[in-house]
């Protein structure tokens, strides 16, 4: 059995980590299967680890976006790759932090490395527009 080591990729910064009610934890295979099912919601999954400095640095930005978009039809999740390596392996996660943008069981985009709040928000709004049919065509022509 081979072991693969995850790497951290991000700029230097302050290390902090916290959880808010706007961000839910994925702790089981069943929860992940529901999320990735054909009726799964628009969601962003943050793959992280406690030892990963860039993950801790990005956590407040991720949570700020989740809080700002609370009540919208988009969900925000965190998956601890140290506690649940088998769930991370299912997505072939190789670097931390990694954000996967998913909708109806499909990965729509991925962001690798620590991201600024503005970048996370822009991608979250893009996914939200895609999931609710508020894309460019709809905005232009109704």
Task: Please tell me what each predicted stretch does.
Residues 24-42, 85:
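A short beta-strand-turn-helix
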Residues 74-76:
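Hydrophobic/aromatic anchor residues within beta-strands of the central parallel beta-sheet
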Residues 54-70:
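Typically the conserved alpha-helix immediately C-terminal to a functionally engaged Cys/Sec
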Residues 40, 48-51, 95:
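Short pre-active-site segment immediately N-terminal to redox-active cysteine/selenocysteine motifs
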Residues 52-55, 99:
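The canonical Cys-X-X-Cys-His
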